[in-house]
C-alpha cells in the first residue's frame, strides 16, 4: 500500500503516521518523506520509534526553511516571506533574503540527533550518494534511519495544490 499526503495534511503528521504504519505492518518497509520543519513538529516521537524497534526510513528534506509555507508565500503571496527561515536569528539583517554564508549554523544536526536517540543518521549532499544511503538504511531493521537530504533553499515541492482548491487545480510546474 502507498499513502501520500503531501500538502493535504497537518504539518508534522507524516512521522507519527509512519510509526503507526510500521507497528501495524512490521514486515513491510515504511518510508516517511518529510521536511526539516515538519519533522521537528513531532521529533519527540523518535523515542517511540526507537523503543518500538521500528526500522522505518525517514527521508528528511533539509532546505533550512519551513519549505511548504515558504513555497506558498512565493507562489501565492508575492514572495512576501514571513517566519519561514529556520536559520533566522534576532541578529539577522532586516532585508535578509534567506540562508547565506553569513547565517548561523542550522540546528539541529539531524544525523547527531538520530544517533542521540539510538537511531541511525546519514547525510546526503550529492546525488551520487543516494543509492548508498538507501542501501545502508535497509540494513537497519532495529531502529529508524534518518537520511537527511541537503537540498537547495529555493527548491519547490511539486505537484502541489493551493489551500482550499480542488485536486483538479494541482500545480505541476
Language-model regions, residue ranges each:
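Short, small-residue-biased leader/transition segments that mark boundaries at the very start
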Residues: 1-5
Amino acid at each position: 500500500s502507498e499513502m501520500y499526503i503531501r500538502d493535504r495534511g497537518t504539518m508534522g503528521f507524516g512521522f507519527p503516521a509512519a510509526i503507526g504504519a510500521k507497528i501495524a505492518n512490521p514486515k513491510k518497509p515504511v518510508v516517511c518523506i518529510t521536511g526539516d520543519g515538519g519533522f521537528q513538529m513531532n521529533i519527540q516521537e523518535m523515542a517511540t520509534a526507537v523503543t518500538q524497534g521500528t526500522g522505518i526510513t525517514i527521508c528528511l528534506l533539509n532546505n533550512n526553511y519551513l519549505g511548504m509555507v515558504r513555497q506558498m508565500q512565493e507562489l501565492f503571496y508575492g514572495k512576501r516571506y514571513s517566519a519561514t527561515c529556520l536559520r533566522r536569528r534576532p541578529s539577522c539583517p532586516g532585508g535578509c533574503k534567506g540562508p547565506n554564508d553569513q547565517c548561523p549554523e542550522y540546528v539541529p544536526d539531524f544525523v547527531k540527533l538520530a544517533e542521540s536517540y539510538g537511531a541511525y543518521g546519514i547525510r546526503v549532499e550529492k546525488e551520487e550518494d543516494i543509492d548508498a544511503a538507501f542501501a545502508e538504511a535497509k540494513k537497519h531493521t532495529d531502529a529508524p534511519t534518518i537520511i537527511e537530504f541537503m537540498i537547495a533553499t529555493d527548491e519547490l515541492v511539486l505537484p502541489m495544490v493551493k489551500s482550499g482548491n480542488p485536486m483538479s487545480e494541482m500545480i505541476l510546474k
